[in-house]
Structure formats: C-alpha cells, structure tokens
Amino acid sequence: MDFRTGDNITAAQLKNGVFIWEVRNPLSFKIMQHRQIRPGSQMYVTQIRIMFNHGLKKALLMHKCFLDLTLYHYLTATSGMILSTFSDQLFRYLNNLGVISIGNVLKGASHILYEKLHHVEDVSLTHNVQYKLY
C-alpha cells in the first residue's frame, strides 16, 4: 500500500523496473536489530532494511521506499555476516534478471531466505513505499 495516499500498489507499479546497469549502487542494506528471542534461546531475530537509493527511486517515480524484513532464524553467524551474505545473494539474483523493481527485489529476497538459507524459520515483511503524486 502507498503510505502517502492509502491506495494499493498496482501490478504495473510492482513490475515497473529499471535495468541494473543504469543505476549505480541501487540498493543499500542496514541491520536494524539483531537479538535472541529470549536469553538462552538459540533462535535469533534479525531485522534487515532494504533501501532504494535516490537514482533508483527517481527512475521508478518513487518518493520513498523501505522494505523491512524480520527474520526468525537459527543462524549462528554474526549479524554482519548474515547481512553480507544476504546482500551478495540478492545482487547476484538481480544481476541474473537484469532488471530491478519492487517485485523482483521481493522475489529475490524470498528466494534467498527460503531456498538458500536453510536455518531461516520465518520471515515477515513490512514496507514504507510512497510514490510521487505529481
């Protein structure tokens, strides 16, 4: 849903993309939170934010685009290693497609988290997407 207007994102907006070689550094990643569910537990909660850069937002006619993924997992690696692996795999997936769009980023993230990383139990997605009104 577009947070500015409250309208649902259309399929055309979801599939609207730009070639990956037209935008430098199209995505950036940030660890928002990494903690155990409760002390002594082996399950961790890691929240990763995927941010679209200015050039990509401009090409896709967006004002703001944040995708927050909350991972519930049993991975024992550090949060930086999880982020590095996730971002490398996502860029590899997007390079193979050749086009970056919201839909492709979401498909790539779900492919990596459910197919490649085997210790991920559950993923929840929240987003903040705002399209330009003019």
Curated annotation (Swiss-Prot):
The keyword Membrane does not apply. GO terms for biological process: viral process. The keyword Transcription regulation does not apply. Keywords: Host-virus interaction. InterPro entries: Gemini_AL3. It comes from the Viruses. Homooligomer. Interacts with the replication-associated protein (REP). Interacts with host proliferating cell nuclear antigen (PCNA). Interacts with host retinoblastoma-related protein 1 (RBR1), and may thereby deregulate the host cell cycle. Oligomerization and interaction with PCNA are necessary for optimal replication enhancement. Belongs to the geminiviridae replication enhancer protein family. Increases viral DNA accumulation. Enhances infectivity and symptom expression. This is Replication enhancer protein. It comes from Mungbean yellow mosaic virus (strain Vigna) (MYMV). The lineage of its organism: Viruses, Monodnaviria, Shotokuvirae, Cressdnaviricota, Repensiviricetes.
